[in-house]
Amino acid sequence: MAKLGPGQGLGCEAAVGLLAPSRKREYKACNKLTEGKRPLYAIGFNFLDFHYYEVFATVGGNRVTTYSCLKDGNFAILQAYIDEDKDESFYTLSWACDLDGTPLLVAAGSNGIIRVINCATEKLLKTFVGHGDSINEIRTQALKPSLIISASKDESVRLWNVHTGICILIFAGAGGHRNEVLSVDFHPSDIYRIASCGMDNTVKIWSMKEFWPYVEQSFTWTDLPSKFPTKYVQFPVLVAVVHSNYVDCTRWLGDFILSKSVDNEIVLWEPKTKEQSPGEGSIDILQKYPVPECDIWFIKFSCDFHFNQLAIGNREGKVFVWEVQSSPPVLTARLTNPQCKSAIRQTAVSFDGSTILACSEDGSIWRWDEVDHPKA
């Protein structure tokens, strides 16, 4: 299958953002909390239910913790889950919900085992086994929040139904990734489409359209999950080489894709696929968002619910906030704290962008709140 490089599009020059903060939005450092000495690899707000917009979770070591962001700038610990295996190291989390709306928290990491926690009963609900190696990222389908997708070191991506415990699809094989899959994301409106990226330096776009009957079947399956006719999706609809090194984070922005590697920038690009000719198409590089000292892998960015603000940390403990949809890109703020010197592994931006959280290599959570943010 042909791999598409940046030259195979319109050839227009990409708009590059300037690193001078516009001060359109000002944030103040207002809190720090240290969970322990083990690195925190993931942090995320719950955008699935407006009752829980102030709730976020972190993972690090064999612990999953949920918090509430209080209006006075403090944190309140809500729940903590300690995995039975003390050697587990969680790398990723995602919020999901059961068919009745019960909030679920899904976490996975070095053991390659997915844990589904019921936040209402505060108990482990389900455990999914299937991946042959560690899991680097889990994402939830916002249009059907009982569907999750996992990206693994075993070079595969898997689609799961958290309600029935079924592994529905495995994206791997002849056209699959050739090294660890580091990040994955569902398209925000095209329910059939996902994007994945990894250590083979590629971003792959996949379609579930012809396999969708199996997705529907997974909701009504009454036999053992192990007896479900799990299907392989072997060929993506597009393979793009936008970066020359590991690609460790990718997110859809409408029909465009944001992705980053270890070369101090995030790239916004447009994939143009041909439905009738899988594997063929073109890509156009649209914009670049510089991020200084962001040259190590497993640093992930995040956005607010409406994809207005994007926040990303670097290896020196600084956070850069970009106005995603401006052209050229506008740097909203550069967030620092004299005590924050460890690598920021992931950020979390609140629903309206008024609070930005970051989790770091030294086990700390950092919080910045917007100054004079208009309250609803």
Swiss-Prot record:
WD repeat locations: 85-127, 130-170, 176-216, 242-279, 291-332, 339-376
One GO cellular component, as annotated: ESC/E(Z) complex
Keyword Transcription attributed: yes
Expression across tissues: Widely expressed.
Keywords of the record: Chromatin regulator, Developmental protein, Differentiation, Repeat, Transcription, Transcription regulation, WD repeat
Listed GO biological process terms: cell differentiation; endosperm development; heterochromatin formation; maintenance of seed dormancy; negative regulation of transcription by RNA polymerase II; post-embryonic plant organ development
Oligomer status and interactors: Interacts with EZ1. Component of the polycomb repressive complex 2 (PRC2), composed of the core PRC2 components EMF2B, EZ1 and CLF. PRC2 methylates 'Lys-27' residues of histone H3 (H3K27me3), leading to transcriptional repression of the affected target gene.
Function statement: Polycomb group (PcG) protein. PcG proteins act by forming multiprotein complexes, which are required to maintain the transcriptionally repressive state of homeotic genes throughout development. PcG proteins are not required to initiate repression, but to maintain it during later stages of development. They act via the methylation of histones, rendering chromatin heritably changed in its expressibility. Involved in the regulation of seed endosperm development, grain filling and seed dormancy.
Family, per entry: Belongs to the WD repeat ESC family.
Note: Plants silencing FIE2 have small and partially filled seeds, and exhibit seed germination before seed maturation. Plant silencing FIE2 exhibit aberrant pleiotropic phenotypes in vegetative and reproductive organ generation, and derepression of some developmental regulators, such as MADS3 and OSH5 genes.
Protein name: Polycomb group protein FIE1
Species: Oryza sativa subsp. japonica
Species classification: Eukaryota, Viridiplantae, Streptophyta, Embryophyta, Tracheophyta
Gene: FIE2
